[in-house]
Structure formats: C-alpha cells, structure tokens
Design a protein with these regions (language model features):
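Polyanion-binding surfaces on beta-sheet-dominated domains and ring/shell assemblies
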Residues: 1-228
C-alpha cells in the first residue's frame, strides 16, 4: 500500500472517520444472508455478504465415535479455506496460520456459547454420534472475514437438515434428507473490534486491518450475553 494512502487512512481514523464515510464504531449497512445455496452437495449452506466481503459456508454430517469423556455427545469440526480467488494475500497449499485461526474463532463462538446441544447428536451412547462438519469458503475478502465467516457458519447450521440414516446398516443416505434440523439453542453473533493507534473500530476493511495493534472478536447471544 502506498505511503500516502496509509497516512490518509490513519489521519481519518484519528479524526473519527473512515475511508468509506463510516464512523469508527459503525458497521457496514449492506449485510445479506442467503440460505440453501448448495442443496445438492451439503446438508446446509449459506452465503453471507458484508459490503463486498463474501463468504460461502457448507454443513456436512457424518457418523463418528464419541470421545471417551463425552460418550453421549456429538461433535463439530470447523475449517476455513483461504484461496487466492478471495484475495491475493492468500496462497494455495496447506492450511495457513490465518485460516486455522479463523476456523478456531468461529468454532469457539459456537462451542462456548452453548448454542448447540451436543447430546441431541447422540445416536447410541458410547458408540455412535453425529459429527457436524462446517466448511467456510471466502469468495472475496474486503475486510472482516471473522464476522462474515461466523455469520455464514451460523446460517448454514440453521439451514441444515439431517440426512436419512439406517441404524441397522450404519449407512447414511445423503440423497434423502429428513425434516429434522440441527438442534440450536441460541444464535451467537460475533463482532470483531480492532485497536489502531489508540482508537477502536468495528467491521474493518482490508486496508484498516493492515494497521491493527490488537484485535478482539466477541460472541453475543440474543439477549446480549457475552459468551465467547
């Protein structure tokens, strides 16, 4: 980024303004959620746009063996794929530190909030449970991927339906889905705040993220309770 642009962004922040005209604690107003965008390849899916930032999330379900310390609970697994298609900052190859961190932030928001009742994912205690797999794919990174991925993951979970499962054979019929939804007790929403030279901003752009001194993502429940 050219030095003159950097100086301009920092000067605006010092004055309580930003490049796109927002106040420091003002979220982008153009937020949209689209459900069921990939009904043939995922049990649940969604697309989220926050400004020009776009993320697609999909939910797949599989059968697994429960962990020894939680024999009556299912599990979730969250992953994020950051490709050059979304930003020239990303590269093909093994998961980067950024993608691992992104997945962990979303995972913690869901897990620590208590939004999912994992006992309702149990098929046979100690032997067989459902595993919910959430994959997130940023399509365009215009800043604040954390919040966009979190919202996309939640939307995909809300859209998901269990596939047919034969307990006798232990086989899943992915071509036929039940009307049963994933048990969600609440809907945690994540908000990310950046500290830049002593000022705090929400919903940062890519350019603003380059100047961060610290970043904090907080998950809230519907009643305003901080849960993660």
């Amino acid at each position: 980024m050219a030095k003159i642009i950097k100086e301009h962004i920092l000067q605006l922040i010092e004055k309580g303004k930003r490049q796109d005209g927002r106040d420091l604690l003002e979220y982008r107003s153009d937020v949209s959620v689209e459900y069921g965008i990939s009904p043939k390849t995922a049990e649940g899916s969604a697309r989220v746009r926050i400004g020009e930032t776009e993320v697609v999330a999909g939910v797949k379900m599989d059968i697994s063996t429960p962990y020894p310390d939680s024999p009556n609970q299912g599990s979730i697994m969250v992953g994020a794929e950051l490709s050059p298609f979304a930003s020239d900052r990303f590269e093909m190859g093994p998961p980067s530190i950024e993608s691992i961190e992104l997945a962990r932030v979303v995972d913690r928001g869901i897990r620590e909030s208590g939004a999912m009742d994992f006992t309702k994912l149990c098929i046979k205690e100690g032997e067989m449970v459902w595993q919910v797999i959430i994959d997130m794919y940023p399509m365009n990174d215009a800043g604040n991927l954390r919040d966009a991925c979190s919202l996309a993951a939640l939307a995909a979970l809300k859209d998901a339906k269990f596939p047919e499962f034969d307990k006798k054979t232990g086989k899943i019929d992915y071509y036929n889905r039940t009307k049963k939804s994933i048990p969600l007790e609440d809907e945690p929403i994540e908000v990310t705040v950046l500290k830049i030279h002593g000022d705090y901003i929400v919903d940062p752009s890519c350019e603003e993220e380059e100047f961060l001194d610290a970043r904090l993502t907080v998950a809230f429940l519907k009643d305003g309770t901080i849960c993660a």
